[in-house]
Amino acid sequence: MGKSFANFMCKKDFHPASKSNIKKVWMAEQKISYDKKKQEELMQQYLKEQESYDNRLLMGDERVKNGLNFMYEAPPGAKKENKEKEETEGETEYKFEWQKGAPREKYAKDDMNIRDQPFGIQVRNVRCIKCHKWGHVNTDRECPLFGLSGINASSVPTDGSGPSMHPSELIAEMRNSGFALKRNVLGRNLTANDPSQEYVASEGEEDPEVEFLKSLTTKQKQKLLRKLDRLEKKKKKKDRKKKKFQKSRSKHKKHKSSSSSSSSSSSSSSTETSESSSESESNNKEKKIQRKKRKKNKCSGHNNSDSEEKDKSKKRKLHEELSSSHHNREKAKEKPRFLKHESSREDSKWSHSDSDKKSRTHKHSPEKRGSERKEGSSRSHGREERSRRSRSRSPGSYKQRETRKRAQRNPGEEQSRRNDSRSHGTDLYRGEKMYREHPGGTHTKVTQRE
């Protein structure tokens, strides 16, 4: 589907793009170029002959003068044909074996670069590195040296015509042909001509230790084995002791670190727990020291340990007594402060009441005092109740109710209420500036606020 017209026409015999016509054109071009080369060679030969003839005439050769030189010289094309035959006889190397007896056209006889494609034969234009033959690679099983290293391949007998299989020469040929080995194979500072690359056979030299062991008898060998076993056991014991000592050290360090971390956490949580933990740690340390001393001096150290314990118990008791006395002193200091504060509050109350009484006695006569006291007490009770109710309500509603009640009252009561409010204001003003002296010599400022 969809093939072009050119693809259809190139299959015709008369079309110039057909394969047969292209081949014919190429063959004709090759013949023309071959003929041109022959003519050029003949012209060069003729020029050389003319030069040699002229030189002989100058030298004075008699044969040239007589004109008999042509009798002793071969025809112009005979020398070249003989040389080509000698070269072809000497050259036995072919890329492939089937090329030795295969017929070839004249223009392709001398040119080895032309690749032949015979019918029914697989042609691989590849050369082996090991055997240097065409048609396979060193990894193919066709190669006669397959599976052999360079050193082993060099030892294999050959006809002598092939190249040597030494690794240094193989590496050089690989480089010339464009291949190269990795550095991991040769090494960084290794070269192909390095003597370490050559195979060196062992000369049968033995170590002095092996000779000494061979010279010993069976009994001496048994003794040596026993000694070696003992030394190995001693080494193992030493290693075990070292490991145990290291483990005990690591455990001791871990215990210390855990105790220090626990003490730091307790101190951060509360000061009381830190004190108790520090005391317990100190007690533990002291007990450890005492145990060590007891182990060292079991017989002589009993009395000393008892005296030390007594001294420590005395020190603890003194410490507890000092802490309790300090606590009692702080309580005793706090009590008078509280009493002074309460007494100052009571004095302020008494001074306020006295100032109210004095202001009322100065302003009013003794006849009106009884009536005013009764009215004041009743009014104070009413005010307290109103203030309690007004706290829960809004201030706007409270003011409106007071104005309505004032309008309902009598004018005589309003005048008496105004007089009471004036007298009360003066009493407040005086009460704010009054001072009272206490027996201790301290002055307290009395203030009254409603």
UniProtKB/Swiss-Prot annotation:
Residues that span the membrane, as ranges: none
Physiological role: May modulate splice site selection during alternative splicing of pre-mRNAs. Regulates transcription and acts as corepressor for RBPJ. Recruits RBPJ to the Sin3-histone deacetylase complex (HDAC). Required for RBPJ-mediated repression of transcription.
Post-translational modification, as annotated: Phosphorylated by NEK6.
Compositionally skewed regions (Basic residues) per UniProt: 233-257, 288-299
Protein name in UniProt: Corepressor interacting with RBPJ 1
Organism: Homo sapiens (Human)
Residues modified as Phosphoserine: 202
UniProt cross-link Glycyl lysine isopeptide (Lys-Gly) (interchain with G-Cter in SUMO2), position: 79, 340
Feature: compositional bias, Low complexity: 258-281
Span(s) of short sequence motif Nuclear localization signal: 235-245, 291-298
Residue ranges with Basic and acidic residues bias: 78-93, 305-324, 331-358, 367-387, 411-440
Name of the gene this protein is made from: CIR1
Annotated region (Interaction with RP9), positions in chain: 204-232
GO BP: any one term: negative regulation of DNA-templated transcription
SUBUNIT field: Interacts with RP9, SNW1, SFRS1, SFRS2,U2AF1, RBPJ, SAP30, HDAC2 NKAP and NEK6. Interacts with Epstein-Barr virus RPMS1. Component of the histone deacetylase complex. Component of the Notch corepressor complex. Interacts with NKAPL.
Record region (Disordered): 72-93, 218-450
Cellular localisation: Nucleus speckle; Cytoplasm, Cytoskeleton, Microtubule organizing center, Centrosome
Region Interaction with RBPJ: start-end pairs: 1-121
InterPro entries: CIR1, CIR_N_dom
Record's keyword terms, sorted: Cytoplasm, Cytoskeleton, Isopeptide bond, mRNA processing, mRNA splicing, Nucleus, Phosphoprotein, Repressor, Transcription, Transcription regulation, Ubl conjugation
Gene Ontology molecular functions: histone deacetylase binding; protein kinase binding; protein-containing complex binding; transcription corepressor activity
Tissue specificity of this protein: Highly expressed in heart, brain, placenta, liver, skeletal muscle and pancreas.
GO cellular-component term (any): nuclear speck
